[in-house]
A protein has these predicted regions:
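Catalytic strand-loop segment that frames the active site of acyl-thioester-processing enzymes
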Residues: 8-42
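HotDog/MaoC-like acyl-thioester-processing domains
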Residues: 81-82, 91-135
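Short, Lys/Arg-enriched N-terminal segments with co-localized hydrophobic residues
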Residues: 1-6
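Hydrophobic beta-strand-centered segment that forms part of the acyl-chain substrate-binding groove
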Residues: 53-87
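Generic structural detector for well-ordered beta-strands
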Residues: 18-24, 75, 117-121
Length: 135
């Protein structure tokens, strides 16, 4: 527990990172079902947002620690087509113990396509995996 508190103090508010993704067919709704249009699927956008959060925080994790998502509140407001580049950004807004709240956004070029918050928690990887396995 003490390492979590120490880490929480080490991560400065405003810490930010970006993840870039060129949209391919496999990232689209059409890859899930051909009835859908070939535009970026919301889960892929959210995945890039979570990736940006992870990239921002991982350098501050102690050995044996990582972060996992605990809540996502995101709006997906505009389509992105195959070949366009999506940039997802995360900025650390708040720390509450071992929980971290990131303001996230995504854009294609200069056009915003989504925004919201992603909450992440610090976990000890070994203990987390024990819990996952039910041991």
């Amino acid at each position: 527990r003490s390492s979590r508190r120490v880490m929480a103090r080490k991560v400065p508010l405003g810490t930010r990172a970006e993840v870039t993704q060129v949209v391919e067919h496999r990232h689209t709704l059409a890859a899930l079902d051909p009835k859908f249009p070939p535009v970026l699927a919301t889960p892929w956008m959210i995945g890039r947002m979570e990736g940006a959060c992870y990239r921002a925080q991982e350098p501050f994790c102690d050995v044996g620690e990582t972060t996992v998502g605990t809540a996502i509140h995101v709006d997906h407001r505009a389509p992105t087509t195959i070949g366009q580049t999506v940039v997802a950004e995360a900025v650390l807004e708040k720390i509450d113990g071992r929980f971290f709240i990131y303001r996230v956004s995504a854009r294609n070029g200069q056009h915003p396509i989504g925004s919201g918050t992603v909450h992440r928690a610090i976990v000890n990887v070994a203990k987390f995996m024990e819990k996952v396995r039910g041991t």
